[in-house]
């Protein structure tokens, strides 16, 4: 059968979609570029916040409206787990596949191929036709025992010079605003050997940047009995990867960042001097209500240690604006913290009241108009900070991973890429005149700094390893 996968949400979902694609391809099914050409359309759903769930339902409705006779629609992933009844009730959905069961996509497709208009049951019942039973969420689930994602054979489909590598799934934290543990469960780490094998396969396929992702990256290996598991993994990873590769760390919660991890990042040439460190707020009372570590002074010391070990490090963080009870004083403390710390990159989320979370039941919910005003204040503040941080690079040479080419309206050719300071999809770009092959590293002298991007010109002197990517 021909299949097409639509991925919504975060990079972890992208990894799961690649896993489903590789499983289906290994079973003889054929990927196609457009949903209209597929016999089976898989939508890997997102349930992060209300807006993500609405987008998921919109996509399911859109695909269902275009379904042709004999075409099937499978809803997979987080929302299929967290809101299974709602997803099952969406018109045209033929099967559900939860976020913990994506590696059983082959069973689902084989079932649909073998018995038209059927879906699966989650309990001990046999496969049953939808036409003869209620279309409840249970009736749509895939049967059988849970298959562990950590050992599922995956052959990644390489589509560019960068790839995400998920090292764990689930989270042991219970932040007051977050629903993820309710459908992902506690953290489960992938074995070091399995990660090394996947990384080696990616490198052999030509991937130049491996981005490590997880719900809680710095907690990696705790369930395996490892101390400083992420640092240990990075040592092993850099031992097998060529020197001209990048390794990037995303979703690194600060209370898991140890002295050993900082030293490991500084020591290995492959590791980008970049850290995505979600903090969510800076005022201790707000953090307590969030069920987050409230020690902002420790965070300041940690940032100082990171910059002492890697003076060129680019730091990114994310914050939630309008959390219940956030007073004007607490908000001012956050803006003061941003001015003091000077992050290179910041993502800002408007608080979303998620049913079933402790935060949803808190008093003093902030009016939306106040959240919006504070969000714009933070964004304007950080825009200026990011511009100033970018200006430090004017006149300097920085290594760039080329991601594509283009041209201006007047026909001038240019290339687009990212430096070590820029994670895929969420950060800025480096643009420079001329053309360079996609997937190659080039050195660029920065000539202009914008709010989030850099402009420059390619220089001839190549760097001989990945170390210069962290700045010369």
From Swiss-Prot:
Residues 1-114 form the MTTase N-terminal domain. Gene3D superfamilies: Methylthiotransferase, N-terminal domain, Nucleic acid-binding proteins, tm_1862 like domain. Residues 391-460 form the TRAM domain. Residues 157-388 form the Radical SAM core domain. GO terms for cellular component: cytosol. The keyword Iron applies. This is Ribosomal protein uS12 methylthiotransferase RimO. The lineage of its organism: Bacteria, Bacillati, Chloroflexota, Chloroflexia, Chloroflexales. The gene is rimO.
